[in-house]
Each structure stands twice: as structure tokens, then as C-alpha cells.
Regions:
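Conserved acidic carboxylate
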Residues: 11
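Two-component/phosphorelay signaling modules centered on CheY-like receiver
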Residues: 14-33
Length: 84
């Protein structure tokens, strides 16, 4: 896998986002972005060229499962791998 791919980390807890970002960085993935819920993440995904999403399940405003459903409904986003 290309180490320069854009990865979006979605979690309402900033500490968890930082932990995931640090783990990815340790693996050589430095092109990471963050969102604090699905409602913030979805426009970022639609506007960006993200290749992978790591998301929490339980978040305010838009839960992870609802974000996943929106990603799978979108013809532009449906092929992006999502780790929950």
C-alpha cells in the first residue's frame, strides 16, 4: 500500500484520534486528516481524495454506522475501505 495515501480518522475523542494518528505515523503513513464526527467527515470525504477511513462507531451528530452508510451510498465514495 502506498504510504502517501490520504487517510481520514473520525472520532469524537481527540485523544483517540491522536493515538490512531501516531500508530499510523509509526507505520509510515503521514498523510492523515481528522474529523470529530460523521457530519464533519462526510464533506471532507466528498471534497478530498481519501483512500482509507478509520472511524469510531459511537459519535454525536452522525454515528460511524451512518457515516458508513452514506459512504456506501455515494458513487464517488463507495469503494473507500472503512475500518470501524
Amino acid at each position: 500500500m502506498d504510504k502517501n495515501i490520504k487517510i481520514l480518522i473520525v472520532d469524537d475523542f481527540s485523544t483517540m484520534r491522536r493515538i490512531i494518528k501516531n500508530l499510523l505515523r509509526d507505520l509510515g503513513y503521514n498523510n492523515t486528516y481528522e474529523a470529530d464526527d460523521g457530519a464533519t467527515a462526510l464533506p471532507m470525504l466528498e471534497a478530498g481524495d481519501f483512500k482509507f477511513v478509520v472511524t469510531d462507531w459511537n459519535m454525536p451528530i452522525m454515528q460511524g454506522i451512518d457515516l458508513l452508510r452514506a459512504i456506501r451510498k455515494s458513487s464517488k465514495l463507495k469503494s473507500i475501505p472503512v475500518l470501524m
